[in-house]
Every structure is written in structure tokens, then in C-alpha cells.
Amino acid sequence: MGGLPVSPKYVIKAKMEIKGSVEKHDIIGAIFGQAEGLLGSELDLRELQKTGRVGRIEVNTRSQDGTLVAEIEIPTNLDMAETAIIAATIESIDKVGPYPAKTEVVSIEDVRAEKRQKIIERAVELYKKLLESVPESRELVEEVLRRVRVAEIVEYGEEKLPGGPEVETSDTVILVEGRADVQNLLRHGYKNVIALGGATIPKSIKSLVENKKVILFVDGDRGGELIARNVINALKVDFVARAPPGREVEDLTAKEIARALQNKIPVDEFLQALEREKKQQKEVKAEIVVPPAKLIKSATKKNPEIAQEIVVPAEVYEKLEELKGTLEAVIYDENWQVVEKVPVRDLVNRLKEVERAAHVVLDGIITQRLVDVAYTKGLKSLIGVRIGEIIRKPDNIVLATFSSVKKSEENIQESVSTGESAQTSP
């Protein structure tokens, strides 16, 4: 009879033993019949069930040694005292039909306690997820700070050299090679950094460092060593810091940058260390299988001689300045029409798939891997911020830097012109 309340507070569990065979409806009838009139109208079971304060009475029976055992459950929405009174009333039932019965309340369960336990367990799960999301929030803050720092890049001097906002006011200046190096140091909070911008020392740099402590921060390879020698010979340098062996400044993490700057050494010690290395090490060149093309060999990473002069359409030339600092690459076809733009980090893989690629301009370094892919795809030219360590270079590909690009008088040019003096003879 009746129905289960929507949200019961308590469940009365009782056991009844009957000395005879009866049906479930006989037991339920006995409960309602014998409880009727005992507690008054406010606690009458039938009325309570009609109003939803007592739910459906569930009865399960089994036979045991000639006795019928009934397990009874009664859900209620009453308060604790009223529920206890109903439970005691159930225990007063001593007869079902013609058979004697004995009733005992086994327990009164607090349904809300179970709900509270589930709430606690769920709260623990949600709290753990919240804790897991905290690092992501920190990363978000770090990303915002990183972008703000990168946005602080300024142009210094008549050469418009990329640098940090504190390069003029700080008593110490960190000299790096290129714009990408400046961006990485700014990203990690070093605002007194400025780029050399090439092999020739700009006049603005010479005047800037006259009364400052100068730290030269170079890549940890042969190219970095050569740049260090060149700068030391032409400029006042107090200390030299090097990236870890084989690493570039633009790729270092915050910890690696801090460690490299902390381990800086005076110029004299740096030059002495280079001489010791030169005496101790025997250079061993591994045999390299190269494509069947005429090669130009360059033992240095940033050899200015390998950068060739190239003439490009006016539209392409004008876009060079916009490309700086974006870390993007633009793929052109033979007529210098844009095929697509891609992030520099994806350029090598994307070039393998593009069919109409003929020229590439990138805000990044021209690496040996990029040259190899360009050769297999039949590209005519690669133009980058600088040229990396090129061991093998096919003659039919022009390698140029932004500084060696010339603007054509024509807007559209079907083929690439290169200065005769810049080409290397076979």
C-alpha cells in the first residue's frame, strides 16, 4: 500500500516470526490493523502513508524450522522521535491472522548518513581534480607573463637592433646573437639583453657598452665559439657565457639560462680554455652520405660567406619585417605567390607534403635538415634570419638571410635572381 517517499530520512528494519503460514499482504494488513488507533490521527500509519510521510512497506518472507520469518522495511520522512515511536509500534504486533507472532526492530537506518558519506566521497574526488587543475592555472599565468615579456622587445639604435627595455638603463648588458635569442631571454625575465644582429659589430653596440659590464652569451657549438672570438676582438667584453654543448641560446629553459650566466667566465679564461681544447681534442670527421649534387662545405654555423644575395619581388621584401618575431614560415611557389603559412617548428614536415613549394622565407634558422628536405623537394631558395651549421649545400639552392635580400623593381618575378658574386663556383 502507498508509495515510497521521494526522499526518506530513515528506514525502520524489523524481523517478525510467525507460527504459521501467511501471505505478505496478511502481514501488511496486521501492521496497519493493529497500529490503527494506538497513536492518534497524527501518527496513524494509513494517514502518514497517504501524505507521503511513510513510504511503501516492503516485506520479504522465508521459512525456517516451521516458522515463517518476515523481514520488514518501512521508510519514513518523520523526525527521529516520531520514527522511533512508529518503530516501537511495529514491535507491539503479536498476531498475524490466527497465528501468534513476535516482532523485533533490528535497526533504524539514517538514510541521510549514507548520503552524507557519498557527498564526502564525491567532495574528495572533486577536490583532487581541483588540485590537479592548479598547475594548469599556474601555466596560464606563466603564459600571460611570457607574452607580456616578449611584447616588451624594443629596437635600439639606428640599426634597430632587437633588445630588452632595460638595455640602456642597466649597468650590465647581455649580448646575444639574434632576435630569437633576445626573445627567449625576455621570456624568462632578462630585460638587459640586446642582439648583435650579424658578424659586423654595430656602432650602436659599441657606444652602448662603453661604460657597462658586458656579458657575451653564445651558443654552445663551433659557431658560438667563432662569434665569441670575433666579438672579443672588436669589442670590450668582460665575461663570456656559453649554452650547454650543442645547444642554442634561443632554445634554453629558464634554469639552463640561469646556470649558463652563473657559470660565466672572464674573457682571458675563456680564450685560454679554447686554446687548451684545441690542443687536447683531435677533430674527427665522420663520413657523410650526401645527395648527388655539387656541394659547398661550411665548417661554421654562422659563416657569413655562405649567405647569398637574392632579389625578390617588392611584395615579398615588404613582408620580411612583418615576419620578424612571429616564428612563422611562408611557403611560395615559383611565381612568389603564397602557398601557405606554417609555424617554423612544423616547416620541415609540412614541406614534405606541399607540392608547389619553390621558395621559403622563415623567421628562424636555416638548418641542415631543412636544406636536405628543400633539396629533395626541388626548392630554389631558403631565406631565414640566419644560417645554421651547413655541412652540405647543393649549388642549385640559394641560402640567404634577411640582410642579404634585395628588392626587385618589379612586383612579380617568376624566377629568382642572385648576385653573380654571391654564387660559389662548382
From Swiss-Prot:
It is an enzyme of class 2 (transferase). It comes from Thermofilum pendens (strain DSM 2475 / Hrk 5). The keyword Nucleotidyltransferase applies. Forms a ternary complex with MCM helicase and DNA. Component of the archaeal exosome complex. Its cofactor is Mg(2+). Mg(2+) 2 binds at residues 219, 221. Residues 413-426 have a biased composition (Polar residues). Residues 171-245 form the Toprim domain. GO terms for cellular component: cytoplasm; DNA-directed RNA polymerase complex; exosome (RNase complex); primosome complex. One of its GO terms (molecular function) is DNA-directed RNA polymerase activity. InterPro entries: DnaG_primase (IPR050219), Primase_DnaG_arc (IPR020607), TOPRIM_DnaG/twinkle (IPR034154), TOPRIM_dom (IPR006171). Belongs to the archaeal DnaG primase family. Keywords: DNA replication, DNA-directed RNA polymerase, Exosome, Magnesium, Metal-binding, Nucleotidyltransferase, Primosome, Transcription, Transferase. CDD domains: TOPRIM_primases (cd01029). Binds two Mg(2+) per subunit. RNA polymerase that catalyzes the synthesis of short RNA molecules used as primers for DNA polymerase during DNA replication. Also part of the exosome, which is a complex involved in RNA degradation. Acts as a poly(A)-binding protein that enhances the interaction between heteromeric, adenine-rich transcripts and the exosome. This is DNA primase DnaG.
